Amino acid sequence: SSDLGDFNILGATLSAGVGRSNTDTKTPYNHQLQFRLNAPFTANIDDLAYQPPYLIANAKFVKEDDLGQYYLYEATFNDELAKETEYSAWLDFKKPFNFSNKVNGYIKFGGKFRQKERRLETNRRYRRMDLAEGYEPVFENMPNLTHSEFKSTYIGINDFLDTSFKSNDFLNNKYKDLNIDFALDHNAMRNFYDVNQDAYGKILTSKILKDYNGKENLWAGYIMSEINFGKYITFIPGVRYDFSDLKYNAYSGSNVPDNEDKEHEFEYERTSDKNHYGYWLPQIHLRIKPVNWIDIRLAYTETLSRPDYDLLAPRTIIKPNVNEVVWSRTNLKPALSKNYDVILTFYQPDYGIFTVSGFYKKIKNFTYTRTAYILEGTTTDPTKFDIPVSMAGGSITYPLNSPFDATLKGLEFDLQLQFRKLHNILKGVVFSANLTLMDSNMSYFETLKSRVKNPNFTPGGTEKPFMPVNSEIVYEDRLLNQPSLLFNVSLGYDYKKFSGRISCNYQDGVLVSEQHRQDAADVESTRPFTKWDMQLKYKLTNRFSLYATLSNFTKSSDRRRRDITNYPVRVEYYGSAAYVGFN
């Protein structure tokens, strides 16, 4: 980007600039080999249905240590390029004014143009290796590969093992049954692909499901002012008009395979769609400072958040084998938020600052994905999606804006203390703490697909005995990824050339997967997370310092669970880290 500079014109300031940025995200090599073990369970599978998932792999229930029985089931190679280029230009004009000694400020207006071009290109190659079309060319290219003892025509695992691999305590050794004592060798996997890549079939389905490109032209113009009424009141009103013009291209197909493992050719076409919208976004800020040690701030703002790019890509994916349709267009609206904030700050220059604030947000136009039956004469009538009437009775999945608003409200307390004015041991103490309490509410819209008896059915007639029905239901819960409690505290001490800090960060559990089923068996959330860190620093000279950092020294983990059973879904241990160096 380039700032063209500030220009003084008749007592006003004109600022202008232009910019360009480019981001390429490449995944040039993603090769996966899946080895399987036939019938490893030594217990009746039905008897394991109510066991916690992490106990099913116990040696009492499964035998998986005979490496000779493993065989190569499938091989997948993926590469991906996501590219985004942005051009921008902006212009601001600022003119100060002074009506009297007690009323002064400035007026400011301007605009910005931003053009975004983005595209996603994927490539997928795949082969089932337990079928003749897979293992025959492989053994022809690599005749010395070890065969599986399970079936002599299959490819075994032994030639792919990393002989230098040493297993550590998996997840702090809490789930001993999940420890893996062997791993695949990356070089062996790479060599396998280099030799046999012609045996991998190109999967067209992935390109149709994922690839897209698009262009967004965004214009914004604003006018605002800052008006000071003496030293005690500052009023900042303003408004911005935000206009977006979007055009996206993707692919549609009418005979798409039901998964990404088939290399069938099928007809597809380029699909284009466009949309535009504009919104007025006002903002009002008021600052009141009745005395030197109190600051009161009130604010009302309106903001927007645009939908995910992938949901804007125009696609009509018809999968006749499973009677399903996946549909999307560029007609989604951005999420709009009305924000109210109140902030009270109390100063004491010798000892610190205390702030208490409250906030309230009301958000509409959240985007969600609906899956429902395709039914004539309803909101999922085939003609509304330009799909064949023959798909009626099938299933369609498509994104849309929620008809319900979400709310978020909370209180935040912030305290910062220091005692440098004291003449005792407390002089070096530095303390800070932040507590945020939040409450959110969201209505999650869900369609229940069911079948009811057809009153017009007669044996031998043309009517079917049951009819598909869409029933709408709303589940109330928290906003996704929104904690109800955040707490951060830091305690430090400074003495001459030494400085030390110890800090703790706490986050309450959050909702990560909302309810879709009536029994709520799909709801997932995270456990509360606490992280401790420590930093030490010693100043050697005016230019050099010795420092040491200890991160997450209590080895806290990030845990995700299924609420109805409390069973873990995902557990991540980040471990602890220590750093020592010069600065």
Predicted features by range, described:
Residues 4-13, 97-107, 122, 229-233, ...:
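Short loop/turn motifs that connect adjacent beta-strands in outer-membrane beta-barrel proteins
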Residues 10-16, 105-111, 235-239, 282, ...:
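Transmembrane beta-strands of outer-membrane beta-barrel proteins
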Residues 18-24, 81, 85-87, 95-97, ...:
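Transmembrane beta-strands of outer-membrane beta-barrel pores
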Residues 20-40, 117-133, 203, 246-255, ...:
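Outer-membrane beta-barrel and related beta-rich outer-membrane complex signature
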Residues 42-73, 134-210, 374-401, 458-474:
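Flexible glycine-rich, low-complexity coil/linker segments exposed to the extracellular/periplasmic environment
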Residues 131, 135, 364, 505-516, ...:
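C-terminal beta-signal and adjacent terminal beta-strands/loops
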Residues 214-216, 275, 304-363, 382-418, ...:
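Outer-membrane beta-barrel signature, preferentially recognizing the C-terminal barrel domain
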Residues 360-362, 379-514:
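Gram-negative outer-membrane beta-barrel transporters
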